[in-house]
């Protein structure tokens, strides 16, 4: 039954992209199949995660038990760091820290968020371009580029195993083609036995769910007049900033289904100034005007972050 469901899901994904003229049908269908395979198969990946901060060796195991996802991400070198997913709860185990659990749909740490993206949503704003085929981890792979049509975002190159549709390599590139991050599989296994081997995790006692205080919901007297196509507001909040004498900060979170960023506005202080910092995929851009400090934080090129900040419009308080 699991194999039948998986096969029918792949067919459905292909049908959608065959009828959608806004994306390369074949490449779009393959990417949607990668999304389905990553969340439905029982498999184990040994991979390296390469960023500007260094290289990590990790193992990721995924299975579906009783219709629920069960996954484990384990750091293989140095101190033992582990992330466990059971259903919609993600538990973190770090040396020197009290274990805790958060709500979530999947493990994002060291895994490309692209893997879990709904490519049907991206189709109007991104091009999916077939680059050819090559071998990764001794597997023949389809190579596909994921590029925003308006040129305001980073891009991806995906190497996907032709048989299982699992990702074997994912590169995140900036607008100049420089690699910001790389996910690269060294070895992998697809087997129903992996689910059996993870039974202990299914029964393990996990740390309690961490209560995350929600921000105060209120209407803001500001909003961006421009964001890249496809981005929409996901949430907004108003909360005190402990590091700045509980100065209230207002935030709006935006996402296009692949990348995300937040717009944060607080009253300017004597220490506020214009500044820009980029670390890997993450940009922090701050500007000061109209007695307010505007900070853009997210997975955006610096030029795009600046354009969003410059577009902020303030309205008179009623």
UniProtKB/Swiss-Prot annotation:
Regulation: Binding to RseA is inhibited by LPS fragments; phosphorylated N-acetylglucosamine (GlcNAc) with N-linked acyl chains are minimally necessary to disrupt binding to RseA. Once RseB is no longer bound to RseA the latter is susceptible to DegS degradation. Thus if periplasmic LPS levels increase the sigma-E regulon is induced.
A single GO molecular function term of this UniProt record: antisigma factor binding
Single Gene Ontology BP annotation: regulation of polysaccharide biosynthetic process
Signal peptide positions (record): 1-23
Keyword Signal tagged: yes
The organism's place on the tree of life at top rank: Bacteria
Keyword Ribosomal protein: no
GO CC field: outer membrane-bounded periplasmic space
Primary localisation category: periplasm
Keywords, comma-separated and alphabetical: Periplasm, Signal
InterPro entries reported for this sequence: MucB/RseB_C, MucB/RseB_C_sf, MucB/RseB_N, MucB_RseB
Pfam families given in the database record: MucB_RseB, MucB_RseB_C
Knockout mutant characteristics: Slight increase in basal sigma-E activity, retains acid stress induction of sigma-E.
Subcellular location: Periplasm
Family assignment from sequence similarity: Belongs to the RseB family.
Xref: PANTHER family: PTHR38782, SIGMA-E FACTOR REGULATORY PROTEIN RSEB
UniProt function note: Negatively modulates the activity of sigma-E (RpoE) by stabilizing RseA under non-stress conditions. Although not essential for association of sigma-E with Rsea it increases their affinity 2- to 3-fold. When bound to RseA it prevents proteolysis by DegS, which is probably relieved by lipopolysaccharide binding (LPS).
Subunit and interaction comment: Homodimer. Interacts with RseA.
Protein name as annotated: Sigma-E factor regulatory protein RseB
Name of the gene this protein is made from: rseB
């Amino acid at each position: 039954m699991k194999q039948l469901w998986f096969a029918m899901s792949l067919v459905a994904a292909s049908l959608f992209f065959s009828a959608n003229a806004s994306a390369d049908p074949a490449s779009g269908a393959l990417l949607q199949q990668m999304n389905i395979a990553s969340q439905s198969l029982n498999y184990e990946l040994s991979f390296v995660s390469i960023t500007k901060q260094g290289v990590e060796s990790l193992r990721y195991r995924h299975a579906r038990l009783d219709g629920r996802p069960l996954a484990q991400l384990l750091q293989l070198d140095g101190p033992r760091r582990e992330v466990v997913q059971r259903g919609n709860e993600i538990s973190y185990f770090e040396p020197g820290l009290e274990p805790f659990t958060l709500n979530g749909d999947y493990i994002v740490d060291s895994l490309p968020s692209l893997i879990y993206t709904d490519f049907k949503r991206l189709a109007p704003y991104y091009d999916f371009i077939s680059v050819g085929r090559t071998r990764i981890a001794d597997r023949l792979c389809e190579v596909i580029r994921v590029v925003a049509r308006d040129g305001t975002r980073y891009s991806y190159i995906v190497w996907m195993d032709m048989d299982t549709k699992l990702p074997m390599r994912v590169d995140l590139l900036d607008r100049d083609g420089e690699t910001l991050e790389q996910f690269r599989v060294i070895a992998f296994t697809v087997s129903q036995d992996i689910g059996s081997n993870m039974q202990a995790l299914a029964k393990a006692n996990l740390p309690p769910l961490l209560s995350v205080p929600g921000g105060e919901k209120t209407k803001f007297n500001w909003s961006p007049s421009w964001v890249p196509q496809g981005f929409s507001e996901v949430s907004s909040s108003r909360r005190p900033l402990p590091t700045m004498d509980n100065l209230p900060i207002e935030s709006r979170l935006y996402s296009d289904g692949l990348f995300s960023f937040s717009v944060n506005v607080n009253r300017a202080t004597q220490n506020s100034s214009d500044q820009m910092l980029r670390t890997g995929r993450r940009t922090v851009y701050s500007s000061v005007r109209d007695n307010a400090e505007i900070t853009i934080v997210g997975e955006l090129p610096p030029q795009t972050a600046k354009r969003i900040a410059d577009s902020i419009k303030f309205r008179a308080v009623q």
